[in-house]
Amino acid sequence: MTSRITIADSAFVHPSAQLYGHVSVADDASVWCNAVVRSEVAHVAIGRGANIQDFVMIHTDPGKPVTVGAYCSITHHATLHGCTIGDHVLVGVNATIFNGAVVGAGSIIGQHAYVRDFMEIPPNSIVVGSPAKVIRTADNRLANRVNAEFYIRNGAAYKRG
């Protein structure tokens, strides 16, 4: 695959982050230290205001792109593989979300959770465990947005130097 990387002017990509393949990074999004985004066979779209934190791994499979919605926080060491993440989602430290999984808007995926292939997480879910399970529902959009806004400010500050 020919590399087709698109980074919005207002986005921040740390110099140690690795982007390869067909990747788009939207306005106000950020990709932090040592994150790896590989898309040899399908597109990776990182939405407006989303943050991909340190050491995150994002990868695709044939026919399984990755979409990260607007104002999401994908936290340290998380892995996204061929999945769809709705808007205003927080994915906890070291969580893994696998091929064909769909995480509904406003959800929180707890640290170390393993969301298996093709699992569908309803909007506003709180999810923990390996294998992952929904333990309750709550509207987390505002809290998740506040976290994302923090990273928007950080990204802008890093861009300014």
Residue ranges, per PLM feature:
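Glycine-rich hexapeptide-repeat left-handed beta-helix
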Residues: 1-6, 40-48, 54-56, 61-68, ...
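Extended, small-residue-rich solenoid/repeat segments and analogous flexible loops
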Residues: 1-36, 154-161
